[in-house]
């Protein structure tokens, strides 16, 4: 018993037999915890249980928790690959007691597991306890038979754990193994404790106090246990190796890397193999948990992890996307323990492939600019923070890649200036935002809920109801009345108005009383159960404690219901057409249209959209009832209902089922309906009430996220009618029947492209002065012994200039070519080419930047042998070429 999967199973089975609930790993994205970027410990999903804010059906639990440490203060990224045990992704095995057993049972369970189940030799083990924890020391003596020299008292924070400045806390006891004198290092607490000989592998936290303020701790009424064992460390111990990367799981991944790059590992390159193996795990699990690469927050950390691995793949000689080829090996090794990995396999592979393709473009472009900006820097110098920030902000070149690229030359980066530039950008963004003023009322909601209670929502059953006004607010403050002409916020004890949530917009309508009429322009939901009606009083005065009639705009609500039900049908249809990796990333359900964001790494083809539309409309034609029922959340998910990523559900949830399986097969395991989702929104009564579904747009909203926009009911029919009229008009212009219009238009477009190619070729020949001679107006001189050929060409854009420069370079054999093309709009493009024998002396990027200013442009980019720039000032063409010549003279 030493394989990673077997060790994990043994741990969980052992604690299950000891009366613990085996709880699945929570997502790497913590729910409702803004203090954490990623889940980084087993106790994270139980934080509210430990504090008493949440109750579970069990008081003992055990988990194998996915963890990532690559952002914020818990950041191991830079060390990964270069040490034996640093990882961005790791698994933490743990057992937990919520007020059930305490120190004696925790120590007994741990000791039995490691000595009996795992077979570790007792004489190789030792422990630490907190300096004042005599109880734990005594228990180790009693249970393990340890002598005093095997129980090391530590008085530092390493052996006292706190959740925060206040809250549950308590002493720790860490279990170590002595790996023998062949390794360097001393026992914990000694001056050389950081060596590898004594390895800590399990931490037992005894939560027995509540920290109230500095220096004040009270005993907890129900002391608890939180333990954490690194699976990778335990695997290394049981497999008799001294590096986590030599365990069976990592050997399989490293072998896959070697196969992908066609290169066997060597000591000099082993760090790169380790980086790729580790980062593959982090990247894949983060994507499976809904994180996609981006430019901020979690997405940016994921992008850094991915691109660090991709750069190491390039170091190993990979010239094509490589990471995605490793995903099947990872799924084979870890998919059984984490089924979400199997479900998301295609999304993970597509995301890695797309990101690596983008990264190669970024790397080439960024390195070219970085080379030009750092050309004059010497060893010990620093690249300016502003330049590094421009590379990051404009070109997507991460700071750590800039640092890595300059490291070999001994050049640093002014990271303080980089951070300052980043802060200025954030501040500018904050100042650009203009709030609605409602933020001033946020602190009010907590007090109101305590005083007047939650709002009872009646909107699932009715669109009209009676209620009592429980609170009125105006300009962020509580008031007792709202008079005619005034706007404000109204709370009632019960309401049929739906408060905006889950992507569905809030209801509008009327609040009425004798002599009073207030128009509800929006309804929001605060703290999950306080419904806030935004009103404008049109007649009379609305008063506190006043009985009122609440009437939802039922025409608008009907359209919203249809659109919300349509999102469910589209969600399932998209999964059927595109694959199980599709997950909802956001939505907007309004009366006019619906917007639906999904995880998918590439544009959705027109034929795929047509299939999605056909499947969804087939369910509409069934006119099947839309059934909603309340269920326990675990029972709902077990029955096949889909839970949306990132949503937090209570113990009881609403399950919305609609339609029959299309083509005779259930789309969801164990589900007898086409779509079954957890949802708190309002829905159509039958699928036929949706009328029709028409997809009107598909676009990208970020890396790996696509947006679908659609219409339903009358809006869908009107859209189709307008499309038909437009198509008929186009057919009339083309003088063809509607059925032949696409072919006729295709033929016209092909003719146009052919004529454009012929025109471009004619212009190129005219610019070159015919097949055999130099272009008219071209001038050739020698500068510093190097041939320099320059010309200005009217009527050519940038894409036409590059072939001309390439041709001129061939004619010259050795030399430099600079050509300015002036378009019909007066804008100009400058292309500079340097023959291969001169690129060591001259850089086309530097030369093109010298001339860009005369054209009214800034910068320029490319490679040492070919670069381009542009600007609005075609009149400066000759001045631009003069500037290039001057730069050549100075370089000579």
Curated annotation (Swiss-Prot):
GO cellular component, as recorded: cytosol
Cofactor(s) named in the record: Zn(2+)
InterPro entries membership: aa-tRNA-synth_II/BPL/LPL (IPR045864), Ala-tRNA-lgiase_IIc (IPR002318), Ala-tRNA-ligase_IIc_anticod-bd (IPR018162), Ala-tRNA-synth_IIc_core (IPR018165), Ala-tRNA-synth_IIc_N (IPR018164), Ala-tRNA_ligase (IPR050058), Ala_tRNA_ligase_euk/bac (IPR023033), DHHA1_dom (IPR003156)
Gene3D superfamilies with a match to the protein in the record: 2.40.30.130, 3.10.310.40, 3.30.54.20, 6.10.250.550, Bira Bifunctional Protein, Domain 2, Threonyl-trna Synthetase, Chain A, domain 2
Catalytic reaction equation(s): tRNA(Ala) + L-alanine + ATP = L-alanyl-tRNA(Ala) + AMP + diphosphate
Cited SMART domains: tRNA_SAD
EC category: ligase
One Pfam family named in its UniProt record: tRNA_SAD
Protein family per UniProt: Belongs to the class-II aminoacyl-tRNA synthetase family.
Protein's job: Catalyzes the attachment of alanine to tRNA(Ala) in a two-step reaction: alanine is first activated by ATP to form Ala-AMP and then transferred to the acceptor end of tRNA(Ala). Also edits incorrectly charged Ser-tRNA(Ala) and Gly-tRNA(Ala) via its editing domain.
HAMAP family according to UniProt: Ala_tRNA_synth_B
NCBIfam families listed in its UniProt record: alaS
Name of the protein: Alanine--tRNA ligase
Lineage: Bacteria, Pseudomonadati, Pseudomonadota, Alphaproteobacteria, Hyphomicrobiales
């Amino acid at each position: 018993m030493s394989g990673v999967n077997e060790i994990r199973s043994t741990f969980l089975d052992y604690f299950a037999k000891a009366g613990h609930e085996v709880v699945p790993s929570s997502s790497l994205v913590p729910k409702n915890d803004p203090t954490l970027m990623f889940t980084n410990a087993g106790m994270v999903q139980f934080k509210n249980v430990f504090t008493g804010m949440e109750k579970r059906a069990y008081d003992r639990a055990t988990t194998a928790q996915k963890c990532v440490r690559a952002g914020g203060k818990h950041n191991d990224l830079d060390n990964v690959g270069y040490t034996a045990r640093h990882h961005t992704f790791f698994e933490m095995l743990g057992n937990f007691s919520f007020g059930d057993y305490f120190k004696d049972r925790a120590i007994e369970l741990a000791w039995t597991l490691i000595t009996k189940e795992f077979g570790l030799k007792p004489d190789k083990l030792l422990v630490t306890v907190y300096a004042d924890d005599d109880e734990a020391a005594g228990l180790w003596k009693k249970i393990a038979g340890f002598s005093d020299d095997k129980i090391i008292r530590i008085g530092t924070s390493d052996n006292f754990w706190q959740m925060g400045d206040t809250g549950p806390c308590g002493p720790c006891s860490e279990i170590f193994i002595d790996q023998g004198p062949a390794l360097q290092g001393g026992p914990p607490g000694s001056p050389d404790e950081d060596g590898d000989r004594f390895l800590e592998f399990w931490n037992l936290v005894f939560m027995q106090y509540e920290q109230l303020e500095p220096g004040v701790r009270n005993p907890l009424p129900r002391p608890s246990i939180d333990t954490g064992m690194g699976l990778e460390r335990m695997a290394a111990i049981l497999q008799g190796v001294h590096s986590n990367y030599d365990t069976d799981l990592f050997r399989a991944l490293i072998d896959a890397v070697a196969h992908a790059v066609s290169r066997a590992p060597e000591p000099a390159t082993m760090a790169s193999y380790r980086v790729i193996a580790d980062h593959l795990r982090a990247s894949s699990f983060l994507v499976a948990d809904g994180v996609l690469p981006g430019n901020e927050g979690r997405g940016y950390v994921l992008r850094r992890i991915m691109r660090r691995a991709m750069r190491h793949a390039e170091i190993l000689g990979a010239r094509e996307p490589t990471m995605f080829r490793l995903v099947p090996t990872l799924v084979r090794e870890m998919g059984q323990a984490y089924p979400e990995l199997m479900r998301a396999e295609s999304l993970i592979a597509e995301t890695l492939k797309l990101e690596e393709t983008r990264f190669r473009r970024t790397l080439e472009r960024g390195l070219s600019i970085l080379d030009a900006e750092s050309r004059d820097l010497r060893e010990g110098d620093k690249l300016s923070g502003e330049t590094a920030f421009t590379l990051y902000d404009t070109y997507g070149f991460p700071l750590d890649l800039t640092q890595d690229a300059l490291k070999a030359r001994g050049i640093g980066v002014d990271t303080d200036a980089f951070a300052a530039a980043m802060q200025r950008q954030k501040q500018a963004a904050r100042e650009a935002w203009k709030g609605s003023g409602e933020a001033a009322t946020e602190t009010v909601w907590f007090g109101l809920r305590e005083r007047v209670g939650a709002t009872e929502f009646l909107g699932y059953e009715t669109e009209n109801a009676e209620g009592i006004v429980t609170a009125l607010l105006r300009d962020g403050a509580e008031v007792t009345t709202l008079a005619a002409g005034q706007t404000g916020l109204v709370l009632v004890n019960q309401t049929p108005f739906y408060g905006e949530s889950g992507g569905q917009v809030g209801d509008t309508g009327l609040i009425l009383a004798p002599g009073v009429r207030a128009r509800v322009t929006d309804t929001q939901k605060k703290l999950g159960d306080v419904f806030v009606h935004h009103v404008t009083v049109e007649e009379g005065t609305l008063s506190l404690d006043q009985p009122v009639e609440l009437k939802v705009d039922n025409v608008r609500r009907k359209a919203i219901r249809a659109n919300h039900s349509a999102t469910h049908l589209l969600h399932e249809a998209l999964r059927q057409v595109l694959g199980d990796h599709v997950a909802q990333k956001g939505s907007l359900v309004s009366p006019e249209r619906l917007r639906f964001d999904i995880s998918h790494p590439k544009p959705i083809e027109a034929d795929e959209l047509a299939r999605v539309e056909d499947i969804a409309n087939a369910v509409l034609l069934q006119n099947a009832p839309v059934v909603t029922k309340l269920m326990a959340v675990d029972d709902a998910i077990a029955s096949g209902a889909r839970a949306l990523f990132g949503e937090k559900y209570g113990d009881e949830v609403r399950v919305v089922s609609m339609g029959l399986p299309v083509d005779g097969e259930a789309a969801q395991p164990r589900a007898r309906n086409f779509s079954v989702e957890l949802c708190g929104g309002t829905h159509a009564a039958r699928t036929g009430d949706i009328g029709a579904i028409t997809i009107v747009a598909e676009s990208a909203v970020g890396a790996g996220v696509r947006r679908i926009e659609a219409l339903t009911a009358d809006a869908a029919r009107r859209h189709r009618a307008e499309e038909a009229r437009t198509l008929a008009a186009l057919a009339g212009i083309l003088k063809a029947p509607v059925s032949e219009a696409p072919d006729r238009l295709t033929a016209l477009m092909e003719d146009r492209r052919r004529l454009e190619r012929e025109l471009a070729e004619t212009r190129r020949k005219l610019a070159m002065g015919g097949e055999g001679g130099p272009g008219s107006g071209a001038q050739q001189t020698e500068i510093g012994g190097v041939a320099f050929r320059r010309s200005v060409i009217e009527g050519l854009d940038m894409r036409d200039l590059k072939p001309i420069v390439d041709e001129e370079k061939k004619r010259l054999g050795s030399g430099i070519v600079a050509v300015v093309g002036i378009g019909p709009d007066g804008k100009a493009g400058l292309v500079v080419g340097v023959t291969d024998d001169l690129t060591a002396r001259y850089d086309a990027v530097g030369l093109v930047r010298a001339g860009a200013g005369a054209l009214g442009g800034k910068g320029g980019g490319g490679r040492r042998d070919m670069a381009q720039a542009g600007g609005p000032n075609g009149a400066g063409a000759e001045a631009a070429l003069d500037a290039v010549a001057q730069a050549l003279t100075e370089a000579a």
